[in-house]
Swiss-Prot record:
Its main location: mitochondrion. The gene is PRELID1. It comes from Homo sapiens. The lineage of its organism: Eukaryota, Metazoa, Chordata, Craniata, Vertebrata. The keyword GTP-binding does not apply. Highly expressed in fetal liver; less expressed in fetal brain, lung, and kidney. At the adult stage, expression is drastically reduced in the liver but highly expressed in the spleen, brain, lung, lymph nodes and peripheral blood leukocytes. This is PRELI domain-containing protein 1, mitochondrial. It comes from the Eukaryota. Keywords: Apoptosis, Lipid transport, Mitochondrion, Transit peptide, Transport.
Amino acid sequence: MVKYFLGQSVLRSSWDQVFAAFWQRYPNPYSKHVLTEDIVHREVTPDQKLLSRRLLTKTNRMPRWAERLFPANVAHSVYVLEDSIVDPQNQTMTTFTWNINHARLMVVEERCVYCVNSDNSGWTEIRREAWVSSSLFGVSRAVQEFGLARFKSNVTKTMKGFEYILAKLQGEAPSKTLVETAKEAKEKAKETALAATEKAKDLASKAATKKQQQQQQFV
């Protein structure tokens, strides 16, 4: 049984800009799990397509229950191969990625197609597919569920990283994420509530003092 993922995202930048950002997206604040990237092969075909292969080293900690199944000396780093085909004439880029170690535990294969958005030629559409499989007897389903959840989390980080690099390349200040904005709003609301509480205490204290003074006048 294989877990399948299908998703579609849109970047509000042109295909040329996204293509340029693709090769410059590491490092970024959302890719701390990506340790290294190396181009191991690159060529231009007779029909002017760019073929590339990169080796990425990532750190993805296993769940604790999975760590018990492997020796302590097993590397926690994951080596990922990425093949890409860029067709500048048709403005498409297709990438294929898969892990080459820890394959007994889990294999995650991903295919992405970057193309011009059909509704807005100044935007780029990303169609993403992934297949998560495991050959571990007895726990393969749990491993696949974990792998799919981790993959979805990494997709979110990938898109945030893309937006960050695109903003830098375009000379803009990277926009805050919704989570960061919500967190700041929550902190501000907490500060406002605290200030209001302190003010209320102060007013209550002054009122009590005034009342006490009035009572003393009638004694």
